[in-house]
Amino acid sequence: MQNFGIFFNPNYERTEPIFNLLKKLHKNKDLQFYNFPQQKELFPDFIKSIEKNKLDCILSFGGDGTFLRASKLSLEFDVPLMGINLGKLGFLSESSLSELEKSIDDLKKNKFKRS
């Protein structure tokens, strides 16, 4: 897996650490990140516009509501969805921002289950 769609809660204000980490992963691990049209204006330039045939997985940054909204995109693009919890409590998210790099490594090694 090299190509990740990025979907996040547009009301989340502390996006700089997220984008800094994604930029590091883009540069160091040769990962590509894509935005969705409904959130295009929220992203820095290194995150490209979505290319449907290139997407391997969607990363949802936020809470359970954001994850549920992103699940529609996961079905539309027929790719797995991984939730990155940005709050204190997230029942549907499998990872946190501090675990993101390891979680992506696990995805690349096919160490995940689709449910």
Annotate the PLM regions.
Residues 1-62, 66-76:
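N-terminal glycine-/serine-/threonine-rich phosphate-binding loop
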Residues 5, 62-65, 83, 87-90, ...:
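Glycine-centered flexibility sites
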Residues 11-12, 86, 96:
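Short, glycine/serine-rich, charged loops/turns that create anion-binding
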Residues 19-21, 25, 78-79, 99-106:
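Residue-level signature of transmembrane alpha-helix interfaces in integral membrane proteins
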Residues 29-33, 59, 84-86, 106-110:
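Glycine-rich loops and low-complexity Gly/Arg-rich segments
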Residues 69, 73-87, 91:
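Gly/Ser-rich helix-loop-strand patches that form or flank binding pockets
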Residues 91-115:
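Catalytic core of DAGKc-family lipid kinases
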